[in-house]
A protein has these predicted regions:
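Bacterial N-terminal signal peptides that target proteins for export
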Residues: 1-9
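Sec-dependent N-terminal signal peptides
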Residues: 10-15
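N-terminal signal peptide c-region/cleavage motif recognized by signal peptidases
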Residues: 17-19
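Flexible, solvent-exposed loop/hinge segments and secondary-structure transition points
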Residues: 22-164
Length: 164
């Protein structure tokens, strides 16, 4: 095989490799610290509407803590619980309430793998992609935890600047 033939083979392999690479990876947004703070601020504003405190945790899509705010008054354990609710919503890519319902419905084995199976964790979606999650604990009820979390998640919906 001559030099021209070798070049053709190399170019073909390069094209095939590029094509395979394009098929096995995709771009996705990443929640920014500014986005995490904006979600927490919206959640805190919702909590203040009800004159209540809450712990608000924001995690990235891998469940890693990005931002935590413990409003007053709320109990100290709320910081841990809110983080676990957020991790559950991020890692399972669904509201933590759905996992709580599954456990209450008899799927008790989920307790071994779900970090925070309580209402109040919501995925954060930007441009149709889950980029993180918010967890809230310590409001006046589990239902209020969820409402506050939804307010935080909704603050970033449709805001591509929250993810890079």
């Amino acid at each position: 095989m001559g030099i021209a033939g070798s070049h053709l083979v190399a170019m073909g392999l390069l094209a095939l490799t590029s094509q395979l690479h394009a098929q096995t990876t995709e771009s996705k947004g990443t929640l920014t610290l500014e986005g995490a703070k904006a979600a927490a601020a919206a959640a805190a504003a919702e909590a203040r509407k009800g004159n209540e405190g809450a712990s608000i945790a924001i995690v990235d899509d891998g469940g890693n803590l990005m931002y935590l705010e413990r409003m007053q008054p709320t109990f100290p354990m709320g910081a841990h619980i809110s983080t676990e609710k957020a991790r559950t919503a991020a890692l399972f890519q669904r509201p933590s309430k759905l996992l709580e319902d599954a456990i209450l419905g008899g799927r008790t084995s989920l307790l071994a793998v779900v970090p925070g199976p309580l209402q109040g964790g919501e995925p954060i979606t930007v441009n149709g992609q889950i980029v993180g999650a918010i967890g809230v604990s310590g409001a006046s009820s589990a239902a209020r935890d969820a409402v506050i979390a939804l307010a935080g998640a909704a603050a970033l919906a449709g805001k591509p600047s929250a993810a890079r």
